[in-house]
Amino acid sequence: MMASRVMASSSPSHTASDLARFAAGRGGGGSAGLGSMNVEEILRGIYADMPTPALPLVGGDRPMSPLPAPDVAAAPRTAEEVWKEITGAGVAAAAGGVVPPAAAAAAAPAVVAGAGAGTGAEMTLEDFLAREGAVKEDEAVVTDPSAAKGQVVMGFLNGAEVTGGVTGGRSRKRHLMDPMDRAAMQRQKRMIKNRESAARSRERKQAYIAELESLVTQLEEENAKMFKEQEEQHQKRLKELKEMVVPVIIRKTSARDLRRTNSMEW
């Protein structure tokens, strides 16, 4: 089991006693109880009983500022050491022997790489702890799909707060458009409007031309009709004048005869 491997590979004696005390505090289940725990619970059980140093008073009234936290390397056991011991114990169990901590630390990256080969990526200590924590959170939280209807969803996308409401699966999305695309769309709309305006102008012009042509045709027909009526009236007047003519008799005048006069004596 994991706990037994950690206890076997750990060199300090107080760590083994802490693990035994923590296992006894869990109900006396022995190795079965420790086997079901993860690295976080083991570390929490180990460092839970460590005393915190008291802060001395300055002048009897105010406490001194807290001391800086000890370095991770100066701690008795760190999470990386426990992880290396676990992976080293796994290598030793596979080889049939016990591997010292130094060899376990050297073999830890290879074991981690082998464990992550099944998924196509290497697994680190942070990934392992995050996966274990995510499993526990998924087991603790139960989500209800029907309860998510009509609730307000808030989140942060690229540093900007996004707020939206779920309304029966329908949502209105406003897409941001590139300025060049917007300008091209405006030019296209303007071109369409210009074409529509030109088409309307052509239609009005054609209608006006057709109206003028019809008016000219009507005037030509009326003019021809008036000329015909005028000619008919002239012919009728001439005929009436011929019928109502007055006969005129012209007498022939006789020529004056020359005769001898007695105006002069010889």
UniProtKB/Swiss-Prot annotation:
It comes from Oryza sativa subsp. japonica. Residues 212-219 are annotated as: Leucine-zipper. This is bZIP transcription factor 12. Plants overexpressing BZIP12 exhibit increased sensitivity to D-allose-induced growth inhibition. One of its GO terms (biological process) is positive regulation of response to salt stress. Keywords: Abscisic acid signaling pathway, Activator, Coiled coil, DNA-binding, Nucleus, Stress response, Transcription, Transcription regulation. GO terms for molecular function: DNA-binding transcription factor activity; sequence-specific DNA binding. Transcription activator that binds to the ABA-responsive elements (ABREs) in vitro. Involved in abiotic stress responses and abscisic acid (ABA) signaling. Involved in the signaling pathway that induces growth inhibition in response to D-allose. Its main location: nucleus.
